[in-house]
Amino acid sequence: MATTTSSSFLAGASITVVSIPVSDQDRALRFYADTLGFEVVADAPFAGLRWLQLSPPAGGPTISLVTWFERMPPGSAQGLVLETDDVHRDHAELLARGVEASEPVEAFYGTYTELHDPDGNSWLLLQAPEEA
């Protein structure tokens, strides 16, 4: 059941960081930065660990490559979605860069290809359907 709240509650809130569980931050950094073109936003010591935050090429919410969440083992992130303006172009480029990606699939919500990072975290690269 929905709860009614003040109309200003969380009015300015947005998702800014999504944690991606990895086993090796350096290997993951090479994949996300060198292979996918993400930009490093922060790479700094963090409570005896390493805070590694990246932004996708088009901006928007960032990802943090994490090793410390006990209930998020490496490879457990599923259903992550990156939106693109041309999934077929990007699928061909992924293959050229050595990334295994499924053949593009058409669905009611757009055309997508699925890929995985070195730990097995699952991403969809999605091209939204053209508006009528």
Regions found by a protein language model. Give the residues of each.
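Short secondary-structure boundary/capping segments
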Residues: S7-L10, D43, Q53-S55, F69-P73, ...
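Vicinal oxygen chelate
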Residues: V22-D26, P57, P73-P74, G79-S122, ...
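N-terminal beta-strand motif that seeds the catalytic metal site of vicinal oxygen chelate
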Residues: M1-L29, G60, A77-L80, P129-A132
